């Protein structure tokens, strides 16, 4: 297929929710929402943990629970955020007042970093204490997020690095 000869509309359809690749990922249960990057990151994290005996097995939680994406067989709660660059910023952590009151919403935060091909580049694991240390308040959005920095990468647990 010569992509240069396709119109913008034809190209858009190839990456749309009605595309064959999207529908197949949906049929496999990988894409449960329209957040493709986030869903791929969750899949890669859970797959990696499941296939490495020294890591706990994780199961996806029902979409929609704020800051809760997976749980381990030990009952630990995981939040999973996915970015597409080692210089990215995670999505939002909502309910800032509970965060400011240090109400622990999860045991671990996994930051999944994908490369330009949406392949796994890195998985960082942060404890609640790490999250609390590195979180930044977004005044405009009234929420928290975390920026991926060298300091963050050097100070938290690296689960996977390509």
Which positions does each model-derived feature cover?
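Nucleic-acid endonuclease domains
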Residues: 1-77, 81-162
């Amino acid at each position: 297929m010569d992509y240069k000869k396709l119109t913008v509309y034809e190209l858009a359809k190839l990456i749309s929710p009605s595309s064959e690749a999207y529908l197949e990922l949906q049929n496999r249960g990988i894409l449960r929402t329209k957040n493709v990057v986030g869903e791929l990151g969750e899949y890669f994290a859970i797959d990696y943990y499941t296939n490495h005996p020294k890591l706990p097995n994780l199961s996806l939680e029902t979409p929609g629970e704020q800051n809760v994406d997976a749980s381990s067989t030990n009952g630990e709660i995981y939040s999973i955020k996915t970015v597409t660059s080692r210089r990215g910023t995670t999505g939002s952590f909502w309910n800032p007042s509970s965060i400011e009151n240090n109400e622990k919403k999860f045991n671990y935060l996994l930051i999944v970093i994908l490369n330009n091909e949406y392949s796994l580049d890195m998985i960082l694991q942060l404890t609640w204490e790490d999250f609390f240390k590195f979180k930044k308040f977004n005044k405009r959005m009234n929420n928290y997020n975390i920026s991926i920095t060298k300091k963050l990468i050097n100070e938290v647990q690296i689960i996977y690095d390509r």
